Amino acid sequence: MFYIYGTSSCGFCDRAKDLLESNNLEYTYQDVTMDQGLIDLFKMNGWKTVPQIFEDEKHIGGFDKLKKYIMEGD
């Protein structure tokens, strides 16, 4: 299961969702601006961009890293 943390105005978040859907991979999406805990998590980890994507508990990174991760079959 993939987890996408982003914002409603994030084009790369939409591209990440499309990529996962086109590869029949399950995901959930959460808007970080709606959850103070996620805002704090972003600050604590120094993440300044969205999306931040995980597969289960493994942090993948942004859209480009997700694309590479899927194409290489990691």
Where are these regions (language model features)?
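Short alpha-helical
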Residues: G11, Q36-G37, G61
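Short polybasic/polar patches that bind polyanions
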Residues: E21, T28, K43
